């Protein structure tokens, strides 16, 4: 007659295995689609992405001093070590924070943002005073790369402008451990390039002026004389600190920074962000190994910074939602 074998005693500590903190989405390395050949109305070829930008949107409550920005750097030391990413703060500890004033303008029904456009003005400050010219930033941000590239954001101005086309990597909206991609087709230029009293002075701006400067916005115009207003009646103060350099190997290095947005005057903290980006000329020359390290580091950092992260948010969306009635963005 067979003898029954008593089951081995189990430890309460071993009853629930610790889940592995791995990626929950397929790797995006090598999966960003190639653009189909196309051209703008003037015959110029469509723009191609030249930046990869990784962003974590953060709760702002842990950032209350310049030193607290560097405290966030301690959070990703382990993810960096795990994936062979070098992180150094040499030369950054002494650098001051950077201050910018940022405001957004839109129609009363958020027609720009609902159609994936963002229009803002920003002014840098130093020692409490504005420096340089106010800058206009106009962008089309969307998850469809081809649509983003074919949207001609170039302004109709006499002065020069600069285009920045970015692949933006963000966490998933609903859980940690994944990556979703947005494509941001930007143009920026000094306000003086379009004359005095246009964009950035929200009470002087209407849709007609906006369409003259940005012809692509004719698609959102309903009628002449429509007014543009300051979004959420709020002017933002951005406080940004470069905290170090990340080295992913194979020549792929970039600055890392932490920033918070708060309301001007009340200094009410709204949202934070950790970001790093690098520029490239030819995507085929980017090291796949370095990109995989970038991705693995970004995934691990999400888990390490769990107490900081604000899933499903962007800085712009936070401003638009300040007074309720959130728009239907494409983000």
Predicted regions mapped to residue ranges:
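Phosphate-end processing signature that detects enzymes handling 5′-triphosphorylated RNA
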Residues: 2-331
């Amino acid at each position: 007659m067979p003898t029954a074998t008593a089951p081995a005693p189990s430890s309460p500590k071993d009853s629930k295995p610790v889940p592995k903190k791995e990626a929950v989405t397929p790797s995006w390395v090598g999966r960003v689609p190639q653009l189909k050949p196309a051209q703008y109305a003037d015959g110029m070829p469509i723009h191609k992405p030249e930046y990869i930008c990784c962003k974590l949107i953060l709760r702002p409550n842990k950032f209350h001093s310049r030193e607290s920005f560097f405290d966030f750097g301690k959070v990703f030391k382990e993810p960096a070590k795990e994936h062979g990413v070098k992180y150094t703060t040499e030369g950054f500890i002494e650098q001051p924070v950077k201050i910018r004033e940022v405001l957004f303008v839109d129609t009363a029904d958020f027609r720009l943002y609902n159609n994936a456009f963002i229009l803002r003005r920003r002014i840098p400050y130093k020692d409490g005073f504005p420096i340089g010219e106010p800058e206009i930033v106009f962008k089309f941000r969307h998850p469809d790369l081809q649509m983003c590239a074919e949207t001609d954001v170039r302004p109709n101005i006499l002065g020069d402008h600069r285009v920045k086309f970015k692949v933006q990597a963000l966490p998933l909206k609903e859980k940690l451990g994944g990556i979703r991609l947005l494509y941001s087709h930007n143009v920026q230029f000094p306000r003086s390039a379009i004359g005095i009293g246009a964009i950035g002075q929200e009470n002087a701006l209407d849709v007609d002026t906006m369409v003259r400067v940005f012809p692509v916005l004719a698609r959102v115009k309903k009628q002449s004389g429509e007014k543009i207003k300051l979004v959420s009646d709020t002017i933002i103060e951005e406080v940004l600190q470069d905290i170090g350099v990340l080295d992913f190997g194979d020549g792929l290095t970039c600055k890392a920074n932490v920033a918070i947005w708060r309301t001007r005057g009340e200094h009410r903290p709204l949202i934070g962000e950790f970001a790093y980006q690098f520029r490239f000329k030819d995507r085929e020359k980017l090291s796949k190994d370095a990109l995989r390290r970038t991705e693995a580091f970004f995934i691990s950092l999400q888990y390490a910074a769990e107490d900081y992260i604000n899933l499903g948010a962007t800085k712009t969306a936070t401003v638009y939602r300040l007074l309720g009635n959130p728009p239907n963005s494409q983000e």
